UniProtKB/Swiss-Prot annotation:
Pathway: Polyol metabolism; glycerol degradation via glycerol kinase pathway; sn-glycerol 3-phosphate from glycerol: step 1/1
Protein's name according to its UniProt entry: Glycerol kinase
Species this protein is from: Listeria monocytogenes serovar 1/2a (strain ATCC BAA-679 / EGD-e)
Family statement: Belongs to the FGGY kinase family.
Entry-annotated residues carrying Phosphohistidine: H231
Keyword ATP-binding: yes
The encoding gene: glpK
Task performed by this protein: Key enzyme in the regulation of glycerol uptake and metabolism. Catalyzes the phosphorylation of glycerol to yield sn-glycerol 3-phosphate.
Post-translational modification: The phosphoenolpyruvate-dependent sugar phosphotransferase system (PTS), including enzyme I, and histidine-containing protein (HPr) are required for the phosphorylation, which leads to the activation of the enzyme.
Residues that coordinate or bind sn-glycerol 3-phosphate: T13, R83, E84, Y135, D245
Length: 497
């Protein structure tokens, strides 16, 4: 039987999905399963790693049954995952010693404060490209080793294993034969030197993490090991591609050349720009990260995150009840010519890149007696585009690369008003693909390259299909006037604390 399909596993923050992708890069079938969020204390977020594994087994079975595709027809498996979420488990039994600590969780704030106090910020920045923040995996591992009796000693003896979710899934799928991660996930740990491409002894010592528990770091596209047959309907299928979710989306968007960038409009926004084989150190509060490693070389990216994007539209729907469903926002915003000087700064949980101001809160400026909900809704949508310009401007400053086009995906990229305004406020075209499942496609393409479904990146590029290209319609003078108003609004919001 011909092996012509790739199974892509997308392990996200609230659900796990499995998709089958054919040789044309089309999604043939999908299965999805949600799992529980655990909130032990305010600001803490955890997952049961065994429940995540059970959800993965369920969606693998579900998608094969739904599509009536045999496991014999699967050429390889690609994995993309919620990044930074951390699991530590017993090497012999395979049982986690504590819940997985999720990327959003703030429970390691005290460890981060101590690292800052001890003066490690420059060391971490210069070796990992990251900031000291509870977001990243290293402090989560330290927290588990501190809070589970005997864990540190067991880790030092080599009895415990550490991994981000990709590592956990590969270990389970292969029956413990492969304890590995890829470059993109390793670069999110605070423990990996992105220049020397190795676990860094100074960083490990800083957090007192035993090297014996760390996975081997491998390319993002390579056959790592085969699945154990009893997990896969009797078949041994190669696990052949891994990338963290945002890097997978960059790959799935075909952003293979230096200077190409994508923005994922989800709950927040994640912007990544490919900077090629050279890591760009940010002077503007952006993260320097590994994009992927393929064919014996690695490529780097600059990353900026916006905390509130799609969640601002949910706020219009659920909090203010201005729209019945999120998609109605496009209709309201398009009814009027402009926001009439209204600016919404959606800093509900502070502002991310390039401001990194966790104390600022949301604000609305420019209201008059004539302001109606259309202006309010439009200004809220526009705030997503302004924040995107803030980050992209910082990327251009850092990299010296001028953006030619922005590729977009994620839920809010379906909003035509927002995409047109995004193009206008950036002054560059915005391209939306037909297939918005770019994260899953990225994982599938990485696996498919390793097992020969696709020959090279040029062949993959052909499977990126344009849905709509939004050309710049706004004059430069108007663009800069609007953007200057946004900056005034942000400064005013920052002054009110």
């Amino acid at each position: 039987m011909e092996k012509k399909y790739i199974l892509a596993l997308d392990q996200g923050t609230t659900s796990s999905r499995a998709m089958i992708i054919d040789e044309e890069g089309e999604v043939i079938g999908v299965a999805q399963e949600e799992f529980d969020q655990i909130f032990p204390k305010p600001g803490w977020v955890e997952h049961n790693a065994n429940e995540i594994w059970a959800s993965i087994l369920a969606v693998i079975a579900g998608v094969l049954l739904k599509t009536n595709i045999s496991s014999k027809e699967i050429a390889g498996i690609g994995i993309t995952n919620q990044r930074e979420t951390t699991v530590i488990w017993d090497k012999e039994s395979g049982n986690p010693i504590y819940n997985a600590i999720v990327w959003q969780s703030r429970q390691t704030e005290d460890i981060c404060k101590q690292l800052r106090k001890d003066g490690y910020e420059d060391t971490i920045r210069s070796k990992t490209g990251l900031l000291i923040d509870p977001y990243f995996a290293g402090t989560k591992a330290r927290w588990i080793l501190d809070h589970v009796d005997g864990a540190q000693e067991r880790a030092e003896k080599g009895e415990l294993l550490f991994g981000t979710i990709d590592t956990w899934l590969v270990w389970k799928l292969t029956g413990g034969r492969a304890h590995i991660t890829d470059y993109s996930n390793a670069s999110r740990t605070l423990l990996y030197n992105i220049y020397d491409l190795e676990w860094d002894d100074e960083l490990l010592k800083m957090l007192n993490i035993p090297k014996a528990m760390l996975p081997e770091v491998r390319p993002s596209s390579e056959v790592y090991a085969d699945t154990v047959p009893y997990h896969f309907f009797g078949e041994e299928v190669p696990v052949a591609g891994i990338a963290g979710d945002q890097q997978a989306a960059l790959f799935g968007q075909g952003c293979f050349e230096k200077g190409m960038a994508k923005n994922t409009y989800g709950t927040g926004c994640f912007l990544l720009m490919n900077t090629g084989e050279k890591a760009v150190r940010s002077e503007n509060g952006l993260l320097t990260t590994l994009a992927w490693g393929i064919d014996g070389k690695v490529e780097y990216a600059l990353e900026g995150s916006i905390f509130v994007a799609g969640s601002a539209i949910q706020w219009l729907r659920d909090g203010l009840r201005m729209v019945r469903q999120s998609s109605d926002s496009e209709n309201y915003a398009s009814r009027i010519e402009s926001s009439d000087g209204v600016y919404v700064v959606p800093a509900f949980v502070g502002l991310g890149a390039p401001y990194w101001d966790s104390d600022v809160r949301g604000a609305v400026f420019g209201l008059t007696r004539g302001t109606e909900k259309e202006q309010f809704i439009r200004a809220t949508l526009e705030s997503l585009a302004y924040q995107t310009r803030d980050v992209l401007y910082a990327m251009e400053q850092d990299s010296g690369i001028s953006l030619k086009t922005l590729r977009v995906d994620g839920g809010a990229s379906a909003n035509n008003f927002l995409m047109q305004f995004q193009s206008d406020i950036l002054g560059v075209p915005v391209e939306r693909p037909e297939n918005k499942e770019t994260t899953v496609l990225g994982a599938a393409f990485l696996a498919g390259l390793a097992v020969g479904v696709w020959k090279d990146k040029n062949e993959i590029k052909k499977h990126w299909k344009l849905d709509k290209r939004f050309e710049v319609e706004m004059k430069e003078e108007q663009r800069e006037d609007l953007y200057e108003g946004w900056h005034k609004a942000v400064k005013a919001a920052q002054a009110f604390k």
